[in-house]
Amino acid sequence: MKWKILSFLGLGFGVAGMLWGYAQEKKAVGFFELRVYTAQPGKRDALASRFASRTAAIYARHGITNVGYFIPQQSDADLGISAENTFIYIRGYPSKEERDKRLKAAHDDPEFGEVVTKQEQDPNTRLIVKAHNIDLAPNGPYTAITISK
């Protein structure tokens, strides 16, 4: 009788652990954004610093995955990439619909307004000259990036 109770408890804890693990499982990203910013001359590092110190955390708080932030190592005139003034990053979401929802929430965040919007609206403190956005979908088995639900 004792072994039946212990077996039942063991099975119960095993199932509970499995379900908890499933609930914690990360879901694959289904939608990415490639963002390419041209910074004001001499302001690229300040822009990168703003992302590192504030903006990335705001995005993460709203469920946006900060996939990566990049500084080009060479210029490419055909692509409009300047090694001195270009800042590139990739964000990830479960879907385009989730992107729209999460990005709106991040942009409506009072901290975002204080840190980014206010600075970019003032011509004397603006860091970004122009921004390009390219929507991307995973292709093939090689996109091994996951984000939290």
Located regions from the model:
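Acidic/histidine-enriched, glycine/proline-rich intrinsically disordered or flexible terminal extensions
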Residues: 137-149
